[in-house]
Swiss-Prot record:
The keyword NAD applies. Catalyzes the NAD-dependent reduction of succinylglutamate semialdehyde into succinylglutamate. The keyword NAD applies. HAMAP family: Aldedh_AstD (MF_01174). GO terms for biological process: arginine catabolic process to glutamate; arginine catabolic process to succinate. PROSITE patterns: ALDEHYDE_DEHYDR_CYS, ALDEHYDE_DEHYDR_GLU. Belongs to the aldehyde dehydrogenase family. AstD subfamily. It comes from Escherichia coli (strain SMS-3-5 / SECEC). The active site is at E243, C277. Keywords: Arginine metabolism, NAD, Oxidoreductase. It catalyses: N-succinyl-L-glutamate 5-semialdehyde + NAD(+) + H2O = N-succinyl-L-glutamate + NADH + 2 H(+). One of its GO terms (molecular function) is aldehyde dehydrogenase [NAD(P)+] activity. NCBIfam families: arg_catab_astD (TIGR03240), PRK09457.1 (NF006992). This is N-succinylglutamate 5-semialdehyde dehydrogenase.
Length: 492
């Protein structure tokens, strides 16, 4: 029984699904998808639970959410192993994901009060108040790269605001989704407040097509995000929050410490086997001898990166991709870039057939035209050379996406110029692109999405503002507008 609907574990009536470890092939989870009828059942359960949940005090909702945080802490080792085994990422990285889930609880509570709490200002004849109200029933679509942390960034603020939820994890990480849901169950959420439906495209389409849905919060690929945007077009009454990745540029303008710059680049491009939406996909490198030296060192260090299993000791920097198919897609993209005229500096290699263990790839594309503006979701870095900083910024902005952008340079003036001209929601200076502050908004512009998911600004789209003018008594104004006559004289 792998669906959690209205406080009960039930068996899915849709297609059967088996999840294997992407490296070893070990069977980790088996179950059935939710069919359309069960998706509708989950929505009705969430709708029925909404009035009572929304009418609880914020403190009562906070108690449940903090109980979930405590359960994450006490079950950290177990959840770390589940996420690592299911995604293929190393144990150390899965542990950081669970830690991030725990930390986001306190941040989300603070964000609710700062971003969407209640405010009151006195007026001569009363008061003006601002309150926030939950939307109602929200669908949350989770991604596979951070199957605990990223859905958590939607679910926690949505629950705190008083919404009820239908959560659909990625079909590639059903085990992690179920494990997290069991902790929510232990936290004592009332039946129907949070529901779990497993499944792939058919389940997702049934969920997004629900008429009684008040909103949809999505993290995933641009293609799926665009489909959801089209599907919900003409429905302005529904909130739609999209985080869709990017084709992110990293500008290496001047690196006094080449090894430090190489380390930053590897952290930006290859951490999580390149499966972070903020990963650097395009390396923009200044022409000249220093750029040549940097590139040679980057290739030399990157070729030492050997992917390993989730529990290898010593622990590897990167593990496998989410699936062998995902790894093959990266290899295919590399071959296509070569065919366009790209010059391979480091070839990505699938270490063993039937696994997702893929080594990083680096390919130079300087002078090649017609390169697709697409996100290759894996450890493949494309390199372009530039002659001046204005050209670098033009190249950085030459994308329909706008998630993250970074600069390596000792010159504050160049960073200030980048801040003014960059089209990206995250712009870092001498820091990896994959680094983001939990108390800052996360997200981008253009094809990278609209709202800012993950805790701090998520509070904004999990509740709507209600403005009020208030007075505890009603009296006739001392001064009336022209044309109004409230005298006792009888009009003849």
């Amino acid at each position: 029984m792998t669906l959690w609907i209205n406080g009960d574990w039930i068996t899915g009536q849709g297609a059967s699904r088996v999840k294997r470890n992407p490296v070893s092939g070990e069977v980790l989870w088996q179950g059935n998808d939710a069919d359309a009828a069960q998706v509708g059942l989950a929505c009705r359960a969430a709708r029925a639970a909404f009035p009572r949940w929304a009418r609880l005090s914020f403190g009562d909702r906070q108690v449940r959410v903090e109980r979930f945080a405590a359960l994450l802490e006490s079950n950290k080792a177990e959840l770390t192993a589940i996420i690592a085994r299911e995604t293929g990422k190393p144990r150390w990285e899965a542990a950081t994901e669970v830690t991030a889930m725990i930390n986001k609880i306190a941040i989300s509570i603070k964000a609710y009060h700062v971003r969407t709490g209640e405010q009151r200002s006195e007026m001569p004849d009363g008061a003006a108040s601002l309150r926030h109200r939950p939307h109602g029933v929200l669908a949350v679509f989770g991604p596979y790269n951070f199957p605990g942390h990223l859905p958590n960034g939607h679910i926690v603020p949505a629950l705190l605001a008083g919404n009820t939820i239908i959560f659909k994890p990625s079909e590639l990480t059903p085990w992690s989704g179920e494990a997290v849901m069991r902790l929510w169950q232990q936290a004592g959420l009332p039946p129907g407040v949070l529901n779990l439906v497993q499944g792939g495209r058919e389940t997702g389409q049934a969920l997004s097509a629900l008429e009684d849905l008040d909103g949809l919060l999505f993290t995933g690929s641009a293609n799926t995000g665009y489909q959801l945007h089209r599907q919900l077009s003409g429905q302005p009454e529904k909130i739609l929050a999209l985080e869709m990745g990017g084709n992110n540029p990293l500008i290496i303008d001047e690196a006094a410490d080449i090894d430090a710059a190489v380390h930053l680049t590897i952290q930006s491009a290859f951490v999580t086997a390149g499966q972070r939406c903020t990963c650097a996909r395009r390396l923009l490198l200044k022409s000249g001898a220093q750029g040549d030296a940097f590139l040679a060192r980057l290739v030399a260090v990157s070729q030492r990166l050997t992917p390993g299993t989730w529990d290898d000791e010593p622990q590897p920097f990167i593990g496998g991709l989410i699936s062998e198919q995902a790894a093959q897609q990266v290899v295919t993209a590399w071959h296509e870039l070569e065919a366009m005229g790209g010059r391979t500096l480091l070839a990505p290699r699938l270490l063993q057939a039937g696994t997702s263990l893929l080594t990083p790839g680096i390919i130079e594309m300087t002078g090649v035209t017609g390169v697709p503006d697409e996100e290759v979701f894996g450890p493949l870095l494309r390199v372009w050379r530039y002659d001046n900083f204005d050209e670098a910024i033009r190249m950085a902005n030459n994308t329909r996406f706008g998630l993250s952008c970074g600069l390596v340079s000792p010159e504050r003036e160049k960073f200030d110029q980048l801040l003014l001209e960059a089209r990206a929601g995250i712009v870092n200076w001498n820091k990896p692109l994959t680094g983001a502050a939990s108390t800052a908004p996360f997200g981008g512009i253009g094809a990278s999405g609209n709202h800012r998911p993950s805790a701090w600004y998520a509070a904004d789209y999990c509740a709507w503002p209600m403005a009020s003018l208030e007075s505890d008594s009603l009296t006739l104004p001392a001064t009336l507008n022209p044309g109004l006559d409230f005298s006792d004289e009888v009009v003849r």
